[in-house]
């Protein structure tokens, strides 16, 4: 009974302990789930009590084992830390006691190094540092003797090197001082210094000035050429006033001027041939037209300076005077010395000028006129060219002109007759203008060639114009009035001014804007014919009458150019050759 009771009590206690352990495990697992989110998948209620007891016992043993192991490791580490300092001291004390010879050798090596550094003080015997040892002292006594025996030549060598270095440094310093004194002219030691006299200094200064002046002139030669080309128009009879002063740079200027004068004829030829690359209107380049118009509007009543044709190709830069343009170099002595009031080119500038609306057009109006059609009222009445003939009561007709073809033929026949006389007059004017300059045989030959080429070109022009008129008259009568009158105005210009036709017909007029008018050129031909009529009045009066008729009938050109103004490439080449020969 007693034995059973002991076992029963033990079983009861085990069950109670297992129940507590189950509760604790369940609480712990719930804590892990709720707080840490760990689900181990254990359910302590399913397991029997003895399993729980065995597991808890095993865990307890593991914990005890881990705690004991950690404690033992901590204790071992503490013991090692406590025992390590005395061991190091014992080792440090045992090393010198074990090897005294090594210490002596180290000391000897150190002493030798110090002796090498301090060789100047080696006359005295060095004493060994540290403790005195018999072996060490013997070695120390032996080494100084050998060192003292070897040191004197080395010391001498170093002293010599130091002396050489000092000498070199002194010589370098002297050279630097000498170079600074003599302004870059190095003077060697021991060399004789040559003194320069005042006369030589003056000559050297003159040479330096000449060099600087020549350098500046060489750099400004293009500017000098430009100024000379501008001012040569005033120097038709006078010489260039540069050589008045005998300065050092004047020789270059005189040479430049002489070269320029000698090559003046060539330059005019180059300029005139260069016009073949530009389209021409009134003898000038088309690219220059807008510039001319804009500047002429702002100029007011400005005068044309009388310039001989030899100075053609150079333009003045003064805004108050107008000289002959490069494009007008080969127009056979046009009268450029007339005032604006007599010129009648630009309306609104001169008081008696003919009111032409095109003369005051600006670049903007050129562009606008391409898109806007012309109005007949602008070219009729007081706004048109009828002011040249105050008795005319011409107005723009609404139907085709019936008698206009006959007038054209008659005017062409009349205008073709006095061509040689007009040519003679223009050639005489050109000879007068060129007579002012000093000319040679070469220029006279050029004049003769010009006359021959121009006579040939005028004859060719008249024949070609007659053919073109015969071909185009039936076509023009059926076309609109502006086209007919534009072709006629071009033909009258070509018959009255053959040299101007050379300039105009030397290039195709394809790229000209369609809205450009030929009215200024018509008026120029009128002014030239006025001049020629004043010189040869009985011959050229008929041409003036025909031109007045053409001016009354002149109309702004339409958008499409008439085909009468075109020429074949062979004719253009012939005219170019004639111009080159001139």
UniProtKB/Swiss-Prot annotation:
N6-acetyllysine carried by residues: 264
Region named Interaction with BCCIP: 72-169
Broad class of the protein's primary localization: endoplasmic reticulum
Region (Interaction with RELA): 101-205
GO CC entries: apical plasma membrane; bicellular tight junction; cytoplasm; endoplasmic reticulum; endoplasmic reticulum membrane; fibrillar center; intercellular canaliculus; nuclear body
Basic and acidic residues bias: start-end ranges: 109-127, 421-434
UniProt name for this protein: Protein LYRIC
Lineage: Eukaryota, Metazoa, Chordata, Craniata, Vertebrata
Gene: MTDH
């Amino acid at each position: 009974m007693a034995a059973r009771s002991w076992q029963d009590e033990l079983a009861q206690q085990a069950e109670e302990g297992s129940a507590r352990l189950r509760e604790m495990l369940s609480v712990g697992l719930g804590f892990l789930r709720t707080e840490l989110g760990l689900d181990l998948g254990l359910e302590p209620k399913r397991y029997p009590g003895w399993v729980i007891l065995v597991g808890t016992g095993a865990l307890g043993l593991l914990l005890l084992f881990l705690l004991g192991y950690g404690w033992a490791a901590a204790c071992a580490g503490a013991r090692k830390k406590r025992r390590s300092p005395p061991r190091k001291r014992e080792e440090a004390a045992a090393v010198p006691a074990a090897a005294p010879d090594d210490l002596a050798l180290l000391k000897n090596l150190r002493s030798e190094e110090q002796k090498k550094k301090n060789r100047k003080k080696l006359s005295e015997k060095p004493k060994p540092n540290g403790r005195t040892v018999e072996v060490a002292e013997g070695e120390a006594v032996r080494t100084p003797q050998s060192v003292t025996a070897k040191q004197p030549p080395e010391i001498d060598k170093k002293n010599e090197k130091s002396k050489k270095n000092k000498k070199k440094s002194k010589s370098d310093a002297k050279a630097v001082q000498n170079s600074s004194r003599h302004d870059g002219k190095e003077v060697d030691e021991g060399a004789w210094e040559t003194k320069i006299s005042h006369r030589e200094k003056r000559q050297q200064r003159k040479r330096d000035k000449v060099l600087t002046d020549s350098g500046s002139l060489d750099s400004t030669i293009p500017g000098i050429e430009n100024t000379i080309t501008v001012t040569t128009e005033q120097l038709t009879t006078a010489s260039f006033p540069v050589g008045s002063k005998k300065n050092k740079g004047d020789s270059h200027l005189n040479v430049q001027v002489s070269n320029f004068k000698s090559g003046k004829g060539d330059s005019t030829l180059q300029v005139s041939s260069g016009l073949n690359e530009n389209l021409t209107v009134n003898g000038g380049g088309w690219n220059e037209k807008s510039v001319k118009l804009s500047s002429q509007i702002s100029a007011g009543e400005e005068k044309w300076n009388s310039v001989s044709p030899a100075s053609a190709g150079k333009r003045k830069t003064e805004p108050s005077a107008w000289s002959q343009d490069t494009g007008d170099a080969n127009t056979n002595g046009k009268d450029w010395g007339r005032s604006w009031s007599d010129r009648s080119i630009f309306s609104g500038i001169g008081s008696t000028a003919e009111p032409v609306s095109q003369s005051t057009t600006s670049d903007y109006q050129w562009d606008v006129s391409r898109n806007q059609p012309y109005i007949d009222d602008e070219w009729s009445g007081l706004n048109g060219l009828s002011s040249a003939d105050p008795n005319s009561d011409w107005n723009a007709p609404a139907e085709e002109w019936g008698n206009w073809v006959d007038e054209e033929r008659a005017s062409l026949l009349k205008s073709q007759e006095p061509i040689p006389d007009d040519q003679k007059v223009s050639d005489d004017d050109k000879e007068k203008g060129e007579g002012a300059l000093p000319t040679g045989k070469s220029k006279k030959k050029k004049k003769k060639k010009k006359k021959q080429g121009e006579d040939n070109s005028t004859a060719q022009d008249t024949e070609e114009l007659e053919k073109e008129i015969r071909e185009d008259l039936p076509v023009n009568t059926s076309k609109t009035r502006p086209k007919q009158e534009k072709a006629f105005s071009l033909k009258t210009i070509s018959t009255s001014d053959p040299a101007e036709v050379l300039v105009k017909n030397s290039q195709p007029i394809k790229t000209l804007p369609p809205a450009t008018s030929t009215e200024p050129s018509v008026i120029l031909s009128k002014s030239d014919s006025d001049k020629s009529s004043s010189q040869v009045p009985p011959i050229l009066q008929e041409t003036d009458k025909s031109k007045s008729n053409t001016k009354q009938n002149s109309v702004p050109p339409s958008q499409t150019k008439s085909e009468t103004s075109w020429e074949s490439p062979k004719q253009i080449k012939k005219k170019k050759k004639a111009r080159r020969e001139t």
